[in-house]
């Protein structure tokens, strides 16, 4: 099975298809001080048409601080990309649910190895 979008897919559908199979995406946020586009690879969970992100250093993560100022980002996966609206949340039960989704996808040991703080998560919604 190819990870490339099909020719007749809309850009949004192509991105959704890649998100359903991928392990890493690139996000591009706007720097809160510089105003410049900043891109970074991140892990994610795509479930029920929802894209969940978990900042590796929780609320201390720079890209997270940037989306607090401008709650949108560009998401790219293997040649498909799109703008998403970002909804950060701090509710402990919701954050814990996202952490569990990450553990299920990437393994508890890798999540423990790479993620140091679990006080925030982000829901990114396609526009």
Predicted regions and their residues:
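Extracellular/periplasmic catalytic domains that process cell-envelope and extracellular macromolecules
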Residues: 19, 45, 115
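Covalent nucleotidyltransferase core used to form phosphodiester bonds in nucleic acids
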Residues: 15-17, 52-65
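Short, structured beta-strand-loop surface elements
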Residues: 3-5, 58-127
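Generic signal for short, ordered secondary-structure residues
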Residues: 13-14, 46, 77, 81
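Extreme N-terminal tail/first-helix region
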Residues: 1-24
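Short beta-strand segments
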Residues: 22-56, 73
């Amino acid at each position: 099975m190819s990870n490339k979008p099909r020719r007749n897919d809309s850009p949004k559908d192509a991105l959704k298809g890649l998100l359903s199979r991928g392990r890493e995406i690139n996000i591009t946020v706007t720097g809160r001080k510089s105003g410049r586009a900043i891109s970074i690879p991140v892990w994610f969970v795509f479930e029920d048409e929802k894209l969940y992100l978990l900042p590796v250093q929780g609320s201390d993560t720079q890209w997270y601080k940037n989306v607090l100022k401008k709650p949108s980002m560009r998401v790219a996966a293997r040649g498909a990309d799109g703008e998403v609206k970002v909804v950060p949340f701090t509710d402990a039960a919701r954050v814990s649910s996202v952490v569990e989704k990450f553990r299920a996808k990437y393994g508890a040991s890798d999540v423990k190895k790479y993620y140091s703080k679990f006080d925030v998560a982000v829901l990114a919604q396609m526009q």
